[in-house]
Amino acid sequence: MSTILMASQQDPVDLWRDSLAKEMPELGFRAYPDVGDPGDIDYALVYWAPHGLIASLPNVRAVFSIAAGCDHVLADPQLPPHLPIVRMVDDYLAAMMAEYALYGVLHFHRGMHYYRREQLAARWNRAWPLYTPDTAVGILGLGAIGGDCARKLGALGFQVHGWSRGPKKMDGVTCHHGPDGLLEMAGQCRYLVCVLPLTSETQGIINSELIAAMPQGGYIINIARGGHQVDEDLLAALDSGHLGGIFLDVYNQEPLPPEHPYWRHDKVWITPHVAGELVPRSCAKSVAANIRRFEAGAPVPDLFDKSRGY
């Protein structure tokens, strides 16, 4: 019987234990700090695990990330370099992220930011609506989450563009790639939604150059990682009027410090990194399926690729 060790400072241990038991009753489960014999552990299920914990497990075969990204795993300087890391790829997580992206786009598209200001001033004013079929949304990142966002925004009638590092094809989406394609897409889109993985290539991608390429009065929604955005460039574009507003769920420093100007800026809407919450009942299916693949010696489709950074 294989055993998995869970180590997370924020995820519900009992829900994970029960959910994994439903999907894989034969799997042993332990939760840090109750490791027991480290040699018993075959798999680690982690989110910001204590540094050195994974290296202390002599027989661990793989690390499962309790997040779509793997930056928290890679932050451990003692992480064994040969160890496979499995990304959390979950349909329900992708659906939640897409819900948030749609909400962010529709918030601005239907003028909710304007109507909130008018409500607080007790003014009965109407804004003329935009024609959705003439309005373009750009998705930065066309993986599982970006693809779901693109399909659902397309179903609402928007023109949908997507950008990725390399060439891609997706039905109903005008696809762009590479540095030139990024600015080309930005120039056509009123709204940009970032769902990229954070890598050395995408760090700071939401910067003054990208913003300047957008039409006057555009909007940005970032639900990926705070490291994608250059805060000073966003604030400057908001204050100049080049950007009409931003909707952020992620930040360069989390929790967002109380003194940060985002809290009080009237063109900024913020939430505390909640766009995609991992629900154990759904994610346990993915974890169990991939453990079975490891046990059978079968290919694991959700492995983190260190050469690509995601």
Regions found by a protein language model. Name each.
Residues 98-114, 155-156, 286-294, 298:
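Oxidoreductase and adenylate-handling cofactor-binding alpha/beta cores
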Residues 42-116:
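Phosphate/diphosphate ligand-binding glycine-rich loop within oxidoreductases
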Residues 115-148, 175:
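Glycine-rich NAD(P)-binding loop of Rossmann-like domains
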